[in-house]
Amino acid sequence: MKLSESVMAQNSVSFQKLQEQCEEQELEAPGGIASPQVYNQLLALYLLHNDLNNARYLWKRIPSAIKSSHSELGGIWEVGQKIWQRDFPGIYTSISAYQWSENIQQIMEAVRDATQQRAFGLVSQAYTSISADDFAAFVGLPVEEAVKGVLEQGWQADSATGMVMPKKPDSAPLSLIPNEQQLARLTDYVAFLEN
């Protein structure tokens, strides 16, 4: 189920605020150890924003007693490891295999949706054609639903061959810098290095 663009934008803002609050709570926690709920949310939010470095450092900071006593935290980290390994089918399997608590459920659904969007984008950039089965595994959807999704995106699907032909993304126009501006930048850079 795809979220509309406006709902996703609203959720993005609220998730960003929640991440800032969790980071603040972690910093202000007595003894430097936050609650497991803060760690759960913060780790999931880092994964949502594809901030894998902060997710890894957070995982290293979390005391091992909290890691071992809260299995949900391990489940979130398992999803993070799959993201790190770019194991897209594994990401979806890990997300759906766990019964998330109420305060994490919405974030993990957003992680799944963001991963699907990222997969759509990667396929559109990297492939001229891909089998519908491989594509469905890559985006974590049943084959019929994946083919329906590509047709909505303006892609082509051939039912006879079972292939999906992605539509190449519109490339952003390159802004050409006039030669004078480029020369001025180089001059400033060289002058900075000499001084």
From Swiss-Prot:
Residues 10-183 form the PCI domain. Keywords: Cytoplasm, Nucleus, Signalosome. It is found in: Cytoplasm; Nucleus. Belongs to the CSN8 family. One of its GO terms (cellular component) is cytoplasm. It comes from the Eukaryota. GO terms for biological process: COP9 signalosome assembly; protein deneddylation. It holds the Pfam family CSN8_PSD8_EIF3K. The gene is csn8. The keyword Manganese does not apply. This is COP9 signalosome complex subunit 8. Component of the COP9 signalosome complex (CSN), a complex involved in various cellular and developmental processes. The CSN complex is an essential regulator of the ubiquitin (Ubl) conjugation pathway by mediating the deneddylation of the cullin subunits of E3 ligase complexes, leading to modify the Ubl ligase activity. Transmembrane segments: none annotated. Component of the CSN complex, probably composed of cops1, cops2, cops3, cops4, cops5, cops6, cops7, cops8 and cops9.
